[in-house]
Amino acid sequence: MSQSTATYINVIGAGLAGSEAAYQIAKRGIPVKLYEMRGVKATPQHKTTNFAELVCSNSFRGDSLTNAVGLLKEEMRRLDSIIMRNGEANRVPAGGAMAVDREGYAESVTAELENHPLIEVIRDEITEIPDDAITVIATGPLTSDALAEKIHALNGGDGFYFYDAAAPIIDKSTIDMSKVYLKSRYDKGEAAYLNCPMTKEEFMAFHDALTTAEEAPLNAFEKEKYFEGCMPIEVMAKRGIKTMLYGPMKPVGLEYPDDYTGPRDGEFKTPYAVVQLRQDNAAGSLYNIVGFQTHLKWGEQKRVFQMIPGLENAEFVRYGVMHRNSYMDSPNLLTETFQSRSNPNLFFAGQMTGVEGYVESAASGLVAGINAARLFKREEALIFPQTTAIGSLPHYVTHADSKHFQPMNVNFGIIKELEGPRIRDKKERYAAIASRALADLDTCLASL
């Protein structure tokens, strides 16, 4: 198939990946037609018509370079990511993590793209894969049925999917502050989380209520397949009575403050379990329950989650919800630049490619956008080094075993190993990998 001669590039979908792709293309002097159906057709999970809306959590996760997602974010900053730049401008306290005011952040991304002289925003639903120009499809896990059918046809008719869920958000003014305390785990960064401590008795009662609560039904013909990083809390609880204690309710590093006077198990300095609440907006009026993605019926959410100390009278401004995520057989369908193997004028980006997470989705949009622009200019494709996070992630999702392919977060395990003797200390090893990654990225960019 010959290269398109159109004078613009299409980007379909203005989520994190599509917004990033559109910006990267326009930044390189190429006109963009950015299509977004929200505004004329709603999705089950989005609450606004803003671009790059955060549906699940407001966290971009860890910020340290000894954390793989922290490394990926730093690489994206060096590549002038619109998502990272606007995220930084709308940060809220989150200890060692990067969390944002979700409304302020999405509004700022939307304004920047809508006001860009080379970006034409078209509020319309796309039901066919365009063939008029180079196109980046970044319609996300909530792709409309009509377009999803066409994409699945590329997939040989097979639809890969999993379920993920969003956590509830509560009104801070309805939290009983006498029962909670402010602290970040291991006192890392500023004290940014409200912690709801539980005794063993309280935890056992909560676990019992959670595992017997009524869930909203799934379609009968679909299996319950979850992405491990966004698993409903009730599913986690059913795996074992202590599973949550090693996950979102882990008490380690969250010792009681000296002035704590609430119930505790004997003289223990650390609670048996802790539920953490994270600030959700810049004003600090909303908090989400960290790691409590759920598919319980709304009435059950209120009943069970009000058992958490401090939340007895909490008002929920948004209940947790679950949605179906579809993704492609990327190992068979896409190249390392997220370009279609069968149609070189077609790129994909975002969660539909098998990357998982906000940051990873934006990173895939960055890679696809840069390479769509390079194709437009008849330049050689840019494949980032496998020693970098932004190079290793697309390499993984396009080279994985297709038969067992599942969505993947960025992690140090997919980045090329260091040469020489293995560094035993994990933090030192990760720091060395990060240092090499940033040096290699700088070298790569300098050569362009």
UniProtKB/Swiss-Prot annotation:
Keywords carried by this UniProt record: Cytoplasm, FAD, Flavoprotein, Methyltransferase, NAD, NADP, Transferase, tRNA processing
SUPFAM superfamilies, sorted: FAD/NAD(P)-binding domain
Enzyme class per UniProt: transferase
Protein name (Swiss-Prot/TrEMBL): Methylenetetrahydrofolate--tRNA-(uracil-5-)-methyltransferase TrmFO
Family: Belongs to the MnmG family. TrmFO subfamily.
Entries under HAMAP family matching the protein: TrmFO
Entry EC number(s): 2.1.1.74
Reaction(s) this enzyme catalyzes, per UniProt: uridine(54) in tRNA + (6R)-5,10-methylene-5,6,7,8-tetrahydrofolate + NADH + H(+) = 5-methyluridine(54) in tRNA + (6S)-5,6,7,8-tetrahydrofolate + NAD(+); uridine(54) in tRNA + (6R)-5,10-methylene-5,6,7,8-tetrahydrofolate + NADPH + H(+) = 5-methyluridine(54) in tRNA + (6S)-5,6,7,8-tetrahydrofolate + NADP(+)
Gene Ontology cellular-component annotations: cytosol
Swiss-Prot/TrEMBL GO biological process terms: tRNA methylation; tRNA wobble uridine modification
Species whose genome carries this gene: Streptococcus pyogenes serotype M4 (strain MGAS10750)
InterPro entries to which the protein is assigned, alphabetical: FAD/NAD-bd_sf, MnmG-rel, MnmG-rel_CS, MnmG_N, TrmFO
Gene from which the chain derives: trmFO
